[in-house]
């Protein structure tokens, strides 16, 4: 996130995660650089290098960095990351994903078959749709269901639903409990 340099409230190491995975018979995990971090993906990359059979790494990439295509190439080729998370919702005054200054980035990511995750709101779906159409072989993931607003009309969420027409767009339902105001099974989120 632009200018956001906070740290997690609790420590969490790759070794701790690996122990939890072993305790619960989890074979492998995708490590994703936290969005409230810096652009340095070093810890994720180091963890993937230490445990290549257990971890896959996704980093952050700065969409405002004029050299982001080269940066992405470095993290993928030299450090072993396989994808990135981008945050269009942090740039409300700009269609940052489809800005011409990021054309080289998208070409680099597509050539590497990178998997891309998006922290986004429904208003950002038009950008993801454009990328999905231009790069139909790339896997694109909508994080946290696109943060549906349960107080808004369901039509406000329609841009996320419309992404279902793209074979290469997937939605992670990781925020059901976080969005819901009801106990499990969180029926207020079911329409989304």
What are these regions (language model features)?
Residues 1-104, 108-112, 163, 179, ...:
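Mid-domain alpha/beta scaffold segments of enzyme catalytic cores
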């Amino acid at each position: 996130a632009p200018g956001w340099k906070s740290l997690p409230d609790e420590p969490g190491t790759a070794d701790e995660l690996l122990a939890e995975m072993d305790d619960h018979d989890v074979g492998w995990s995708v490590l994703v650089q936290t969005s409230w971090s810096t652009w340095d993906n070093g810890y994720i990359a180091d963890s993937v290098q230490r445990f290549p059979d257990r971890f896959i790494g996704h980093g952050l990439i700065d969409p405002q960095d004029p050299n982001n295509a080269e940066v992405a190439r470095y993290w993928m080729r030299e450090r072993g990351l396989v994808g990135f998370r981008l945050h269009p919702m942090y740039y409300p005054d700009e269609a940052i994903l489809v800005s011409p200054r990021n054309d080289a980035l998208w070409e680099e990511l597509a050539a590497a078959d990178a998997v891309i995750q998006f922290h986004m709101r429904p208003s950002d779906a038009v950008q993801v749709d454009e990328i999905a159409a231009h790069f139909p072989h790339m896997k694109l993931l909508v994080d946290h269901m696109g943060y549906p607003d349960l107080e808004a009309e369901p039509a406000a969420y329609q841009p996320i639903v419309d992404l279902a027409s793209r074979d290469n767009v997937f939605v992670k339902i990781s925020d059901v409990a976080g969005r819901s105001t009801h106990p499990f099974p969180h029926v207020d989120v079911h329409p989304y």
